[in-house]
């Protein structure tokens, strides 16, 4: 019997250096959870680079729209929600990601 892979979301916006320093966290999560797909939520400027990481399976772009642009924000939340993540590692821990936490189905949410 083949086990279904868990989906885990990692949220990391921010500067290039911060994202590169997070690579060790990506590696650790990938090794601690067996049979897992790691998805990274980050800015569009880092998408192509992060897809080169052997630890990241998918990248979802979050261009951090203004809070009054609810249509785009909820479109992103819906995209995230359809992937049914079992865990979310929130490395950003911001007001924006707190908003995501409120509206997403209830995965296990881990913040820094």
Feature map (PLM): residue ranges:
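Catalytic machinery of carbohydrate-active enzymes
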Residues: 1-112
């Amino acid at each position: 019997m083949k086990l279904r892979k868990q989906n885990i979301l990692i949220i990391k916006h921010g500067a290039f250096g911060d994202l590169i320093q997070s690579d060790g966290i990506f590696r650790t999560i990938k090794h601690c959870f067996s049979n897992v797909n790691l998805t990274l939520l980050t800015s569009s400027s880092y998408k192509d680079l992060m897809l080169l990481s052997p630890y990241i399976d998918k990248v979802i772009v979050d261009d951090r729209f203004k809070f009054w642009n609810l249509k785009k924000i909820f479109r992103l939340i819906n995209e995230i929600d359809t992937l049914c993540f079992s865990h979310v590692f929130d490395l950003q821990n911001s007001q924006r990601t707190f908003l995501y936490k409120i509206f997403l189905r209830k995965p296990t949410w881990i913040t820094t």
